[in-house]
Amino acid sequence: MAHKKGGGSTKNGRDSNPKYLGVKAAGGSTVSAGTIIVRQRGTVIKPGNNTGIGRDHTIFSLVDGVVTFRNGRNDKKRVEIVPS
């Protein structure tokens, strides 16, 4: 007879690495060109004036200015930069 219990298998015990998604520059804050404004999965927030979008849907600033969030058509949220 075994004097130790067998190590049973389990379906738990895993965790994924954090992805650090979300808004990185709040509305009204001043940003410089190239600053990441939003990191997201899919286009939850659409890019507006003076912003660009990366291949992973990250929205970033193209000019120096102030971040502005606004609601566009069809309930789509947009972020844009007002140049300073």
UniProtKB/Swiss-Prot annotation:
Task: Give the organism the record lists.
Answer: Chlorobium phaeobacteroides (strain DSM 266 / SMG 266 / 2430)
A single Gene Ontology CC annotation of this entry is: cytosolic large ribosomal subunit
Q: Could you cite one Gene Ontology molecular function of this protein?
A: structural constituent of ribosome
SUPFAM superfamilies named in the record = Ribosomal L27 protein-like
Q: Which family does it belong to?
A: Belongs to the bacterial ribosomal protein bL27 family.
Taxonomically, which superkingdom?
Bacteria
Q: Which InterPro entries match?
A: Ribosomal_bL27 (IPR001684), Ribosomal_bL27_CS (IPR018261)
Q: What's a BP term from Gene Ontology annotated to this protein?
A: translation
**UniProt gene name:** rpmA
Q: What broad taxonomic lineage does this protein's source fall under?
A: Bacteria, Pseudomonadati, Chlorobiota, Chlorobiia, Chlorobiales
Q: Region (Disordered): which ranges?
A: 1-21
Q: Which keywords does the record carry?
A: Ribonucleoprotein, Ribosomal protein
- Entry annotated with the keyword Membrane: no
Protein name as annotated: Large ribosomal subunit protein bL27
